Amino acid sequence: MLIPSPDPFASCPGYYLPDFEPFKACTNISNFCNHARDVYNIEMLLRWAIFIIPCCMSFFALFLNIYIFYVLIPNLRKMNGRSKKKYIFILSRAVSASMSILAIFLLPVIIFLTHFNFWVIALFIIFEMLSFLSFIGGMVGTTLTIYIAVVHPMYYQRELSLRKCVLLILLLWVSAITVAISCGIVEAAFIGRNSPFSCDYGNCAGPVLIFGIVCIATAFSICLVIQLYVIISLWKLGIQSTKRGDYSSTSKALTGVKRKLFAGFFVFATMAIFEIASAIILVRSVSEQTQDLDACDKLSASTSRLQFVISCVVLTLLW
């Protein structure tokens, strides 16, 4: 008579999941409960930090964006050409923010409702990168418009027409689409068997993610350099106005503009630091992963996989 082997997860209350059934026969595991806790934490992080919390935040942000469109679009039609030149960039940024929200909704849909394959992942990355790059472009356009309006007011009034602003926005969007498509195709190179590239996970994951970090860091750097240049230029202009004894309302307005730009620069720089740092941690975690492990090897590597998921969570919440 065969004696059934004891359940190694029986002494792990609160951590047991139905997914543990394939791991009961593993012989290379010494402490099942520790690994069960890691797998349970991974499941909870995926459920709450990548699905429920981002979706709740996105619903709130989506309502705010709908309100912005509801208020901005009718008023934009009533504005004169000078005001439209400023708010057309704000409208572009609102579109980018809405795309970012939709990208957050797409992530759990891809994870839970579809099979991972090259075209699905590439489409998601393209959409996400397009929202990010178009947002960066909107920030750059708004900052440059403020710079021209303050430093070169005559050119802003006479030469910088609404048509030129629209053409600039179209140029930024076309550039964002081009870069996003390139990033989407490259970053999804090792996903699925139907990928047009013969590149396996172990060889491609690290270089592809490094390529993504370079693209993101370059976009952040361009925007931050332009913001810093405008802040320094306005600061010098303010010093010159003070030396001339100019204490008019225009000078006070310049001080307010500088404060807003500096606050935006600080927030954007903080976001860039955390985004790039989290991406670097993600690359280090990916370098330790492999898709060729069997179920028991995957369970034994649960700690490193938990760190990998935490990196993904940080990136998701930051975005």
Swiss-Prot record:
Stored InterPro entries: GPCR_Rhodpsn_7TM, Put_GPCR_Chromadorea
Gene3D superfamilies registered for this protein in UniProt: Rhodopsin 7-helix transmembrane proteins (1.20.1070.10)
Molecular function terms, GO-annotated: G protein-coupled receptor activity
Subcellular location: Cell membrane
Any one cellular-component term (Gene Ontology): plasma membrane
Ranges that cross the membrane: 49-69, 107-127, 131-151, 166-186, 206-226, 261-281
Family annotation (SUPFAM superfamilies): Family A G protein-coupled receptor-like
Keywords per UniProt: Cell membrane, G-protein coupled receptor, Glycoprotein, Membrane, Receptor, Transducer, Transmembrane, Transmembrane helix
Keyword check for Chaperone: no
Topology class, membrane: Multi-pass membrane protein
The keyword Nuclease is annotated on this UniProt entry: no
Residues carrying covalently attached carbohydrate according to the record: 28
Protein family: Belongs to the G-protein coupled receptor 1 family. B0244 subfamily.
Name the UniProt record assigns to this protein: Putative G-protein coupled receptor B0244.7
Protein's organism: Caenorhabditis elegans
Lineage, broadest ranks: Eukaryota, Metazoa, Ecdysozoa, Nematoda, Chromadorea
